Amino acid sequence: MAFTFKQFHIDDGQCAMAVSTDGVLLGAYAPLTQAKSVLDIGAGSGLLSLMAAQRTQADCQIVAIELDQNAANACQNNVNNSPWSKRIKVVNSSIQAYCDDLASLSSQVDNQTAAITPTSKFDYIISNPPFFENGPSSQSPERAAARHTHNLPFSALFNAIKSLLSPLGLSTIILPVQSLESATLAYQEAGLKLSCQRFIASVQGKSPYRVILCLQHLSAGDILLALGAGKSLNPLSETSLFIRDNQGQFGPEMASLCKDFYLKL
């Protein structure tokens, strides 16, 4: 299926996971406008990478990592047809292999060549990851890989974010609310902390079904606080953002976030 936004076009016909409202909301919500380097983990059709390119300055470079070959090809085609083809690099790889390749490259760099080696750290990391931890798998292996965590468990995702995020960087992901507890254990074990979280309801008045997490590195002070006082590092959650009101229209915050992307806003 094809989707036309205000500044770019997405064809996701070869992708296991189609463009979704969740993805558009994540791309619009993430506070990445000042980033100079962005990593999109599990890029799929390239939606988040293209939204990041639209929202950042011209000197921001974006890397889109996608495991599935067909999706990576679709992502590359969508990037090539966008205004930002020179700013987005598509890599057909797992994030685990990408981390290993960067580590191998770093080990081969001496002090004389370090200055010209591309940075392996990113100001911002964004991901709409596979998040179903159990339940029936899709009949399509590609769709199963895109939806279920067996290829990218939370531990691997958050360890990759920990490894690739710059010291003052920020990462934003979206998950089902039922995955929040296991995700929290995984990001804390990886050495990350919650900067903010936002619950998402599909309709005004309904219980949240998704949660957006903003993560950053633990500081030395955070570690001492946790060890010494046993206090939670998680701030209080904000009120839920609802996608549609009871009349089926976009809620005011949703409309404000997405007005630069959706044609009819």
Curated annotation (Swiss-Prot):
It catalyses: adenosine(37) in tRNA1(Val) + S-adenosyl-L-methionine = N(6)-methyladenosine(37) in tRNA1(Val) + S-adenosyl-L-homocysteine + H(+). This is tRNA1(Val) (adenine(37)-N6)-methyltransferase. Disulfide bonds: none annotated. One of its GO terms (biological process) is tRNA processing. Specifically methylates the adenine in position 37 of tRNA(1)(Val) (anticodon cmo5UAC). It comes from the Bacteria. PANTHER family: TRNA1(VAL) (ADENINE(37)-N6)-METHYLTRANSFERASE. It is found in: Cytoplasm. Its EC number is 2.1.1.223. It is an enzyme of class 2 (transferase). Keywords: Cytoplasm, Methyltransferase, S-adenosyl-L-methionine, Transferase, tRNA processing. InterPro entries: DNA_methylase_N6_adenine_CS, rRNA_Ade_Mease_Trfase_CS, SAM-dependent_MTases_sf, SAM_O-MeTrfase, tRNA_Adenine-N(6)_MTase, tRNA_adenine-N6_MeTrfase. GO terms for cellular component: cytoplasm. Belongs to the methyltransferase superfamily. tRNA (adenine-N(6)-)-methyltransferase family. GO terms for molecular function: nucleic acid binding; O-methyltransferase activity; rRNA (adenine-N6,N6-)-dimethyltransferase activity; tRNA (adenine-N6)-methyltransferase activity. It holds the Pfam family Methyltransf_3. The lineage of its organism: Bacteria, Pseudomonadati, Pseudomonadota, Gammaproteobacteria, Alteromonadales.
